[in-house]
Amino acid sequence: FDKSGHYKWQNFDQFLTIYEIVTNIFLDEKNFEALVRHVLDKQVKENVIYTEIFLGPHLWSDRPNERWERFLNIASKVADEYEKKYGMYTYFIIVCIRHLGPEKALEASRFASKFKDKNVVGFGMAGDETKFNTLDFMRSFDFAKQSGLGTTTHAGEICGAKSVDEAIKLGVTRVGHGVRSCESEETIINLSKENILLEVCPGSNIALGLYP
């Protein structure tokens, strides 16, 4: 921790390590439900009426099992409660963890496609942008798209514009971050041509030292 009590890291690898350690706190179902409620309470205070939340099931268990379904049911139950109480719509994007590899990604994609009735609207990829070739995950994204899910992947934050070019080839409808697209005029043009939205998060970019 730093002097103000915040988590402290020196690089992206350390950030990912700390992130995964912290997620262990939420392997308890009561803690996980409390986390979902905390997030949605903050949204209500900000007068947000539509929210999409990333859920990474491989952080709950290293393989698909009934635990995945239980945790999704918890999140979906809370989302329905807040919709009835506050009129706020909450949906989920199931994400694979890139550095766990393509086979794990396919597990997450199949899970997302199976539970579209549980407020799941999309499939995405987070994690270490430097691991594996982006196109190694094509099968997972194709499966999700064929199931009618929206798709997104992190690119263009830790890695440069080339990583965004690879994300475009996946056929995603959004790119998480994507800020380093500005390093290539061609990348910007291609994003525009394909009508791909950038999910920009300045807080992450600053926290990870990408920008001062």
Give the role of each language-model region.
Residues 1-149, 159-163, 169, 174, ...:
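Metal-cofactor-binding active-site regions of metalloenzymes
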